[in-house]
Amino acid sequence: MRAERRKQLFRLLGDLPDRRPISVETLRIEEREENIVETLLLDLNGHEKAPAYFVKPKKTEGPCPAVLFQHSHGGQYDRGKSELIEGADYLKTPSFSDELTSLGYGVLAIDHWGFGDRRGKAESEIFKEMLLTGKVMWGMMIYDSLSALDYMQSRSDVQPDRIGTIGMSMGGLMAWWTAALDDRIKVCVDLCSQVDHHVLIKTQNLDRHGFYYYVPSLAKHFSASEIQSLIAPRPHLSLVGVHDRLTPAEGVDKIEKELTAVYAGQGAADCYRVVRSASGHFETAVIRHEAVRFLQKWL
């Protein structure tokens, strides 16, 4: 049943490329005070190369656990992967690159379609072109994330069985979708991204989210909690702001109720948590603290 539901979800994501070996070009290696930053160019999909950063601790003994960092949207198309290193005005400091490497994790971030060094076409144009040619923008973004996992596992300095994912907003959505579709993700942490698409329709909030996220026929076959149930029983933490209009409370409550039952049914009640912060669509000190603590516990 689980495998079939996962196949069904993949089928909704449009015509995806065949899985392929990942080629990488190292453009630069920069040694910073606390970590080492590799600037990379990854051929993840055979259509368009993805610029990436891999950041690792300076002092490690052997391969390290690693985190796939998913950047947010925020209408900041020039940012992309640089969010990992530079942060954003809605994220706390230190940057996730400094935070995570200080804890001993390696971190990979890629530019998703239309962001960072892959910008040039508008998001709406990419969405429409892909729709016309049998592809789904969200599906191609997910494909790149799954290929990024292939690359992470190929690195000799990464422990291939200790990979987690984290992201904020669009990045949080990508984190839980990637975890739902691939068991190689051992821990999932999402920030400000518990969006129930059925509740968005009900509350007339569809226009609060970009074109990138809309998958044809998704609402006919899956709810948000049904997708995320594919993560269970692996550890999953969702961090939400109670005043976040992009994640209506009705949807968050529904997802939490249903996933709590799923995890309990699999004997993993302690592996799923929802933490609410008295805030809007941004990271708070509470959110950062809980995210870091969860990663340290499970990864």
From Swiss-Prot:
Gene Ontology molecular functions? serine-type endopeptidase activity
Q: Which GO terms describe its biological process?
A: proteolysis
Pfam families documented for this protein: DLH
Q: InterPro entries recorded for this chain?
A: AB_hydrolase_fold, Dienelactn_hydro, Pept_S9_AS
UniProt superkingdom: Bacteria
Q: Does the keyword Iron apply?
A: no
Q: Which UniProt keywords apply?
A: Hydrolase
Enzyme Commission designation? 3.-.-.-
**PROSITE patterns xref list:** PRO_ENDOPEP_SER
This chain belongs to the protein called: Putative hydrolase YtaP
Q: Which organism is it from?
A: Bacillus subtilis (strain 168)
